[in-house]
Amino acid sequence: MSTGLADNVRKYRRTAGLSQEGLAEAADLSLSTVRKAEQGGHVSMETLHTLARALGVSTSTLFATDAPKSVLGKRDEANRRYLAELRRALMPAVGLSAPLSDPGEAGELSELRRGVQEGHALYWADQYGAVAKRLPGLLRSSEAAVSALEGEEQEHAMIARCHALLLTGKYLTQVRQYDMAYFALVEAIRLAREAHQAQLASTGVVGLCWLLLRQDRFDEAEQLAAQTAREIEPRMSEATPAHLAVWGELWLRVASAAVRNNRPEVAREARRMAAAAASALNTEDESFPHHWGGFGPVTAELKAVEDLSLVGDTRSVLRRTDDGILSDKSVRNFGRPTAPNWGRHRLDVAHAHVTLGSHQDAMDELMQLRRTSGEWLTHQPMARYVMADILKTRKRTLTEDMRSMAAHLGVAG
């Protein structure tokens, strides 16, 4: 943790009139954790959120600018090689004249649209390597199509390229290549606006807000999502399912940012708006690229339960996870949410179990996710936090499943 952030924790503690012991008690954290935070040691975002809540400030208030830590290592070097072709297609070298790279041949628009759908299906199927191999060709051929066509056909080509960029941004955000993802998403939003496709641009904003959340840019994510949601607010009686879905997704982003930033009133109102959109939709919908990801009554409820996890109400997480809208009967009625949304929810359940000392129940959740979404799981910090807690707190000998999962997630005992 940066010295500036440590200074901020100390400053706001003193402003609140609390000793270190008093802050530890107010936040329900150990005294050693508070001391670690004020000494510049590494603490999780969950801990920072807990400290901010106890201090009565937004989480982002505690942040401070400092030099980043080195990320050099074998994995960083490997990732640069793995993404070299995609980087060239997305971010070509540019000089005083034309780009150095050849965009290739213009693809048929129907083939481009089909390629995006096939790539997205691979993304949902946890086939990240296959997605990475497919994206460079989609980006080059869609760029060439925009350059080669004119008039109405060019506008259709711009929309097809926007779809390819949205898929690229989604994939790169998932695998935590944030700067590349930002480039793809901002370019998609720009193209959609240029083509007068407000709903498509809003889909890009949903993706960009997800990226901002992953970068802990809570204020910006909340403000951008709320502003866009107000600009595209639908008439419920006339709105298409895709319009309702993207509007609801924007409110989900507002809520996610606000709850992480210790703004519970804003989060509650945003959840209410998302629930209204989900109720009007009355089913789960995942029609990318007409909207970003899955949305519907089940997804809206999953995200409300996520709020409970973020504020440490683990018993309520477990109580609501198989009740009401999340019961088996309701899920069958409304439709199953997307694999990433469902997986994130089950990680919240695993986290609740391990917090309450139910190691085997937590492992059951992790093992099921490994069977269904093993590659996705390796990109989830929450999975590593849960596994690390199991290794740290379990008093008995680790099971074979525990050792195997720790190796899969790269968590040392």
Could you describe each region identified by the protein language model?
Residues V9, Q20-A24, S32-A37, L62:
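Conserved hydrophobic/aromatic packing and binding residues within compact polymer-binding modules
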Residues T65-V94:
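Short, charged recognition helix plus adjacent turn
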Residues R13, A24, A52:
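The alpha-helix within a helix-turn-helix
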Residues M1-T15:
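A short, Lys/Arg-rich alpha-helix, primarily the initiator
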Residues G104-G413:
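Conserved binding/catalytic microenvironments
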Residues G56-V71, A300:
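Short C-terminal boundary/hinge segments that cap the last helix of small helical domains
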Residues D28-V43, D66:
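Recognition helix of helix-turn-helix/homeodomain-like DNA-binding domains
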Residues D28, E46-T61:
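DNA major-groove recognition helix of helix-turn-helix/homeodomain DNA-binding modules
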